[in-house]
């Protein structure tokens, strides 16, 4: 049975994660406060950041940057700025 949580990012009740996806206290916070839908949105932004900024997860500085962007996006409502990216017009 799916768990329902109040998603901090979406500001509504939504289906929660099945298990903790990220380590440590931040991972616990994500598990308790971020829905599957919001996490999927973050993963799209994360992929774009990694590709456009040519980040490597072997570099501790790159991991710190990505974690800071994740916290800003999921918990502080800040949009991820990706240089050179123009969203498609609707």
Swiss-Prot record:
Keywords: Iron. Could be a mediator in iron transactions between iron acquisition and iron-requiring processes, such as synthesis and/or repair of Fe-S clusters in biosynthetic enzymes. HAMAP family: Fe_traffic_YggX (MF_00686). GO terms for molecular function: iron ion binding. It comes from Enterobacter sp. (strain 638). The keyword S-adenosyl-L-methionine does not apply. InterPro entries: Fe_traffick_prot_YggX, Fe_traffick_prot_YggX_sf. The keyword Cell membrane does not apply. Belongs to the Fe(2+)-trafficking protein family. This is Probable Fe(2+)-trafficking protein. It comes from the Bacteria. Pfam families: Iron_traffic. One of its GO terms (biological process) is cellular response to oxidative stress. Monomer. One of its GO terms (cellular component) is cytosol.
